[in-house]
Amino acid sequence: MNQMNPAFVMPDVQSTVDTRQIPIQRVGVKAVRHPLTVRTESGDVQPTVGVWNLDVHLPADQKGTHMSRFVALLEDSREPLTVERFRAMLASMLVRLEAEAGRIEVTFPYFVNKTAPVSGVQSLLDYEVTLAGESRNGETRLFLKVLVPVTSLCPCSKKISQYGAHNQRSHVTIDAELAADLPVEALIRIAEEEASCELWGLLKRPDEKFVTERAYENPKFVEDLVRDVAQRLDADERVVAYVLEAENFESIHNHSAYALIERDKRHAA
């Protein structure tokens, strides 16, 4: 077994000078699975598993970044995740990596306990959530993205049919840039309230009747869905910009109907 000479100094190759003089905009680690806890709107703590992407800007004269420091940051971040805690993580990463700019992104399943509309039975429904933050030129921007499954029912189908109307599951995806703390549940509520009907994990027969009739009484094209959600986001001062998408998985076609609205309130007329 080789014995290391106590006088030997292990070289730090990453910190050596790179003669090619080409900066790298983003370098780091991607798709790191790591457990985390999330602070919910009610103040409870929810355990989940996040998929993390962390990267920084690398100057032209530096050969490499310190990859292990990204994972060390996750190991040291044990407190429940909030928007402010996420902002602090981003600042800590820049200090640890001695970087002027960087980005952190984490995607995780988030569960909401929902009560059925008639029977009152409770069940969990999962949502895909992404929290992202980037710091550049002394400015920090935070983004909250939520994919919300809902039901949509076609107004045209209802109008032309003697009975019934085609309906389907849809995805509403809200990617919002935040001006202030905004609970995940707030974006979920906006999407669900503007859909033909929301979803539940568990329904009894009286609930299923309610859901069917609720959607029938509230038909919406994919265009209606994104416009109605956009109005809600426009009125929310906690959101400064957003990319909003709706996709209807059409039950009478082998393709989806799709719509997108993108708006930055800072540049609005």
UniProtKB/Swiss-Prot annotation:
Pfam families: GCHY-1 (PF02649). It catalyses: GTP + H2O = 7,8-dihydroneopterin 3'-triphosphate + formate + H(+). Keywords: Hydrolase. One of its GO terms (biological process) is tetrahydrofolate biosynthetic process. It is an enzyme of class 3 (hydrolase). InterPro entries: GTP_cyclohydrolase_FolE2, GTP_cyclohydrolase_FolE2/MptA. One of its GO terms (molecular function) is GTP cyclohydrolase I activity. Pathway: Cofactor biosynthesis; 7,8-dihydroneopterin triphosphate biosynthesis; 7,8-dihydroneopterin triphosphate from GTP: step 1/1. Signal peptide: none annotated. The record marks C154 as: May be catalytically important. Its EC number is 3.5.4.16. Belongs to the GTP cyclohydrolase IV family. Converts GTP to 7,8-dihydroneopterin triphosphate. This is GTP cyclohydrolase FolE2. It comes from Burkholderia ambifaria (strain ATCC BAA-244 / DSM 16087 / CCUG 44356 / LMG 19182 / AMMD) (Burkholderia cepacia (strain AMMD)).
